[in-house]
From Swiss-Prot:
Single GO biological process annotation from the record: IRE1-mediated unfolded protein response
Catalytic activity field: alpha-D-mannose 1-phosphate = D-mannose 6-phosphate
Stated name of the protein: Probable phosphomannomutase
Disulfide cysteine pairs (residue numbers): none
Residues reported to bind Mg(2+) 1: D14, D16, D214
Top class in the EC scheme: isomerase
Subunit organization: Homodimer.
Organism: Caenorhabditis elegans
Binding of alpha-D-mannose 1-phosphate, residues: R23, R129, R140, R147, S185, D187
Annotated function: Involved in the synthesis of the GDP-mannose and dolichol-phosphate-mannose required for a number of critical mannosyl transfer reactions.
Active site: residue positions: D14 (nucleophile), D16 (proton donor/acceptor)
Molecular function terms from GO: metal ion binding; phosphomannomutase activity
Signal peptide feature range: none
Subcellular location: Cytoplasm
Length: 254
C-alpha cells in the first residue's frame, strides 16, 4: 500500500542504459520489479527516443501496456508525453526554430558526418522527431555488433564529443542545445527542451522527484535533469544497478 510519504514521491527513469541495456528490450524480471515498486510509489519514464522506440523496448510494441506500467510516460525528453493515458500537448522543433535554420543545421551535419572516417557506416544518419533531431555518425540502422564497435571507437577518438562541439560553436546562437545521446548519436533540441522539460508536469504534484540515469555527466542527455535542484539524482550503470538504487530509496520510504 502506498504511504502518504511515498504518494508525494515519484521515481523517474531514463530508459536506455537504465531500465534496459542500450537499445535492448526490458527483461521480464525488470518489468516485474517495476510493477511491484509501483505498488509502493508512483513511477515515470523520460527517454530521449521517440514513443515508438520506447514502446518497443519496454512493452513489446504495446502502447496500452506501456501506459499501464507508469503513472507518467515521457518520450523525446517529455515533448511527447502522457499522464496515465491522457496526452500532453506535443511540442515541435520545426515550429520552435523554423525550417530555414533546421535545413542549415541538417546540411552542415550531413557534410560533417560525410568526412568522418569510421570502421563502418550504415544508414539513417538524421532522424527527425517531434521535439529534436537525432544525428548518428554511424547511422541508426547499424547492427548491434556494429553499434558496439562504434561505442569502442567513440571512446578512443571522441567522435561525438567533437561533433557536439562543432555543432555548439556553429548553431548555439540559434537557441539550440546539443547532447550526447545513447550510444551512437547526438541530440539537438531547443534550449530548455532537455529532460528537465518533463518536470513542469511533475513538480506541482510531488515534493520529492528521484531521477535515475546513466548519462549524467556534463554533455550527457541525462545531465540537466540529474543536476536540477528539483530532483534527487542517481547515476546508474545499467538495469541491475538501477534496481539496487531503487531498493535503497524504497527502504528510506518505509
Amino acid at each position: 500500500m502506498t504511504s502518504p510519504a511515498s504518494s508525494r514521491t515519484i521515481l523517474v527513469f531514463d530508459v536506455d542504459g537504465t531500465l534496459t541495456a542500450a537499445r535492448q528490450t526490458i527483461t521480464p524480471e525488470m518489468r516485474e520489479f517495476l510493477i511491484e515498486a509501483r505498488k509502493r510509489v508512483p513511477l515515470a519514464i523520460v527517454g530521449g527516443s521517440d514513443f515508438k522506440k520506447i514502446t518497443e523496448q519496454l512493452a513489446d510494441h504495446d502502447k496500452d501496456l506501456l501506459l499501464s506500467l507508469f503513472d507518467y510516460t515521457f518520450s523525446e525528453n517529455g515533448l511527447y508525453g502522457f499522464k496515465g493515458t491522457e496526452p500532453y500537448p506535443v511540442q515541435s522543433i520545426q515550429k520552435a526554430i523554423g525550417d530555414a535554420k533546421l535545413q542549415e543545421l541538417i546540411n552542415f551535419a550531413l557534410r560533417y558526418m560525410s568526412d568522418i572516417q569510421l570502421p563502418v557506416k550504415r544508414g539513417n544518419f538524421v532522424e527527425f522527431r517531434n521535439g529534436m533531431i537525432n544525428l548518428s555518425p554511424i547511422g541508426r540502422s547499424c547492427s548491434q555488433e556494429e553499434r558496439m564497435q562504434f561505442v569502442e571507437f567513440d571512446k578512443k577518438h571522441g567522435i561525438r564529443q567533437k561533433f557536439t562541439e562543432q555543432l555548439r560553436e556553429k548553431f548555439g546562437q540559434y537557441g539550440l542545445q546539443f547532447a550526447i545521446g545513447g550510444q551512437i548519436s547526438v541530440d539537438v533540441f531547443p534550449t530548455g527542451w532537455d529532460k528537465t522539460f518533463c518536470l513542469q508536469y511533475l513538480v506541482p504534484d510531488f515534493d520529492t522527484i528521484h531521477f535515475f540515469g546513466d548519462k549524467t555527466a556534463p554533455g550527457g542527455n541525462d545531465h540537466e535533469i540529474f543536476a536540477d535542484e528539483r530532483t534527487v539524482g542517481h547515476t546508474v550503470e545499467g538495469p541491475e544497478d538501477t534496481r539496487k538504487h531503487v531498493e535503497n530509496v524504497l527502504k528510506e520510504l518505509d
